[in-house]
Amino acid sequence: MAAVQVVGSLPSGQLREAPRDAIPEGGNGFRRLSARLCALRPDDSSSARTEIHLLFDQLISENYSEGSGVAPEDVSALLVQACRLVPLNQNHLVSKVSQLIHHLLNRLQVIVDEQRLDFLLAYTISAIHQCSSWTHMEILQALAALVYCNGSKCQKYLLELLGETGLLMKLSDLAQSDPEVRRAAVHCMANLCLSVPGQPYLEEPYQNVCFQAFLTILQSPKSSDMDDITFCMLLQNALKGIQSLLNGGRMKLTQTDELGALLAVLKKFMFHGLPGLNIEMPMVLYPTPLPQYDGRTPIKPQQSESSASRPTLNKKKKSKVKPKKIQQGEEEEKESSGEIEAAPVTGTGRVNLHEGNTWCPSSLGVQSLPLDGSGAAGKDGVSSPFSSSSWKRVSSSESDFSDAEGGMQSKMRSYQAKVRQVALVCFLSTIKSIEKKVLYGYWSAFIPDTPELGSPQSVSLMTLTLKDPSPKTRACALQVLSAILEGSKQFLSVAEDTSDHRRAFTPFSVMIASSIRELHRCLLLALVAESSSQTLTQIIKCLANLVSDAPYDRLKLSLLTKVWNQIKPYIRHKDVNVRVSSLTLLGAIVSTHAPLPEVQLLLQQPCSSGLSNSNSATPHLSPPDWWKKAPAGPSLEETSVSSPKGSSEPCWLIRLCISIVVLPKEDSCSGSDAGSAAGSTYEPSPMRLEALQVLTLLARGYFSMTQAYLMELGEVICKCMGEADPSIQLHGAKLLEELGTGLIQQYKPDSTAAPDQRAPVFLVVMFWTMMLNGPLPRALQNSEHPTLQAGACDALSSILPEAFSNLPKDRQILCITVLLGLNDSKNRLVKAATSRALGVYVLFPCLRQDVIFVADTANAILMSLEDKSLNVRANAAWSLGNLTDTLIVNMETPDPSFQEEFSGLLLLKMLRSAIEASKDKDKVKSNAVRALGNLLHFLQPSHIEKPTFAEIIEESIQALISTVLTEAAMKVRWNACYAMGNVFKNPALPLGTAPWTSQAYNALTSVVTSCKNFKVRIRSAAALSVPGKREQYGSVDQYAGIWNALVTALQKSEDTRDFLEFKYCASLRTQICQALIHLLNLASASDLPCIKETLELNGNMVQSYILQFIKSGAEGDDTGAPHSPQERDQMVRMALKHMGSIQAPTGDTARRAVMGFLEEILAVCFDSSGSQGALPGLTNQ
């Protein structure tokens, strides 16, 4: 029966003709042969079959070079015609047409269109059902090529292929007698799971079916009738299938057993075929470090150690290796080396694994590698402590294999290495598809916490990094480790080993600290041993991830010193990627928990030290200059003794980075500088950018050291910002911003820098004059590069206020004019940066009393508050908050001219804009309410009396009340309560008599008693204690409501479900006690019955907390509460004095009860302090 009868007729389509002279030779051959094929009609004669057979052979043997000019639709049309010509009862022809489908689709990288795919799928599925079993292998290969990246277009056939009794389910089953057919069926399933971005994915039920099928295959032992290479290919296909399901986060592993089962097989096959290891894994890994997780055949500790701790043990064995054997090992390395970044899935249906790989090592950047003197090759042919590959120790005699057997062994090792690589890449996809907190439950299964000495749990990712003979597998393992470490700061922060551990059990914190130590040890061992540049780059990136997240302030000293000393030589490595990643690592060291005393000492190491202790055996080092000698330096202990504090020894790292940025490159290390432009005299751009980044991090973390180079760094910045490359310009601007920020920090009131250690103002003025006379203004006006403009704006906002006032007048005017002009920019990045910069300038003492500048800035900010970009509005709201802070500062100066001259109309506009902004997103809202509070505080009686202001004041206060009560972010509600306190400070507002008074107080009392966040409660209690007069609290009922709410809040000051809030309990009680005493100080005779009633019910509780308040002193709160016990005691005395002055009606007991309560508190204070001398003021009691 002809194939055409299986699926009905489908036109093969017209083949496109291309101009003859434009068609390459391969395209010509294809068109000639396809024209002959299209001319044929279905015919069962033997001559017709012979002709078709010959045509198929010719099409298969045709040389299809890249860019052969063959159109995908022509290939699809030809395959449809071929299938129409071959009836399903002709097994040999069906086999041949299947080979043709597989060959053409793979060779020409064609994905079949949906219409022809339908026909070809129906044909191949029918062929499997009807043809002899010996054809199934070729038909399945054709099916795999057809469904490749076409899973979403195969919906019609999914039930037939993947249903309970589906074709692929049966052929991939363990019961399938032919191992090759089983492997090919799994290959088809893996290709079905592969999807193209933007297209629909495989439906969830079928995803689960495939996942379970792949998992079953991986959990099943190798059957006796399957050879090792077929088994490796089967494993690869199953692993690639799972990877395709996980990629892009499409399939979620939500069940613990499901994830644990997958991790168990991944761990098993990460080590597949690694010599000397025979891993027996449980079916499921559970997220607890139990000893049964990882059993393996015991190995003598000496053997396990030999390739890591004791490299000398292998010397004899290395000398026995024959040159011929080494070449085979080298060939195997070339075959399995390459970049992990090359997506391993995309070739699933494009490589016939039977035919071996045809990768060209040179095209992958693998260096040709020499042999060492003894004739032994290392991982890449370079002698190292790990150079004797473990598989060479499998046999007791090197001559046990014939050449043919040796070739087979080499091929076997190559396939096993690929299984390990695919397992690692699949693990990478798994990591990306699960939450980090879930992943860290399995930390101990993959990360070592003790040196590897053959114990059951000692195999880990570091085993592969140190012992795998394939550089690509080592790179894969490192990339997985990097993914695990990335974002692990919170998890690792629990680590601690600063004190000696002498407990009966090992705390979790000590176990994590041990893991961190072991990771350092193993990665530094790997660094010494590695000679492949690509893998070396991965090791250094991995170290950078580890250094960024490890809590060195909680770990014993010397870990960073070892990393520091060992990485220095690699800064002069001949491969630019290694050099760049080495600088990245140094940047990570100077940014982690900065400033660290250990790093401070490392930065102060003398520049004259040599390389004697710093891995002088490391290859590819060029002769270093005086600052490039990468000193190992003395130990940390020696340094602390020999380097006096304040040593003027230059910082070698700053010198190095400056030289990389500004000095011409050396020829000796430019061999593989792919990043440098042709003819460039400088280091490659990535190297210079990384050096600028390190300088920026040094300025951020170790400014006291960096400031010694202030003017020199200024010249570096000017040079960078004057270059043509916008990236170099931008990084120069970032460095300028960081230096400016460092100078500002030195002059802040809370700075730890002594006045004589600060950079003098005249020097800062010189520095900024150099900047403003250099290329900075040009960068600010470079509208072609808005990112650079925004960076330059940020830099300009980091001028020290004291220096700005001393700049030449024309430079001051330049800064202000440029910023006000850029606020009109159409680019949102520039506009956001400008809005923020104006918010900084408006706080400068020399500008804040300039009414014209403040008004111009206000108008610019109000315009930005209406921008479509949230980021622009957020920055504008922050600046509006700063501007209103300036209004308050000016209000408190003796000179009233600013208030008088500031436009009332502009105040109205600011109030309206702030009200609108308070309805915006939280990022805008938090500063909008801050601004509202300041503006209402600033309003003068002359404003409030005007009818135009009455309505806007009411609206503003309603906006604040609604924000206090809303379920917004903590910062928003905190700022709203703070703003309400500012409103209460304005004596001109009718607080106490206005209708909004009760609403405002009710909002604050609601928050103080019930808000989940204690910082917001503290701020609302502070606001309630702001009014200075009794009448501002309104009626007796209003006063009683506030008093009762504060007592209730005190009672509930420990009621929280959030453990993090407990640290604010003491501050909350302090603020509530202060508010209660403040209310007592203002109470009138009519308020006393309510106070007495509350004290009768809760007097003991209130008394105990007020006693704590008096005795405790400062609680670290930020609300302005009196901080010394003497001051607090005085508050209670004043309240008692006030009570005594109240004229109560005859027979009134309330005043006496309240006075008794206060006297009792003071008496207890006197008694408790008697042994140490009475507190001031109690001696007359």
Curated annotation (Swiss-Prot):
HEAT repeats lie at residues 159-198, 452-490, 514-552, 558-595. The keyword Cell wall biogenesis/degradation does not apply. Residues 294-347, 371-407, 613-648 are annotated as: Disordered. The modification Phosphothreonine is found at T618. InterPro entries: ARM-like, ARM-type_fold, DUF4042, HEAT6. The modification Phosphoserine is found at S336, S337, S399, S402, S643. Residues 383-399 have a biased composition (Low complexity). Keywords: Phosphoprotein, Repeat. Residues 300-312, 637-646 have a biased composition (Polar residues). The keyword Repeat applies. Residues 313-325 have a biased composition (Basic residues). Pfam families: DUF4042. PANTHER family: HEAT REPEAT-CONTAINING PROTEIN 6 (PTHR13366:SF0), MALARIA ANTIGEN-RELATED (PTHR13366). This is HEAT repeat-containing protein 6. It comes from Pongo abelii (Sumatran orangutan).
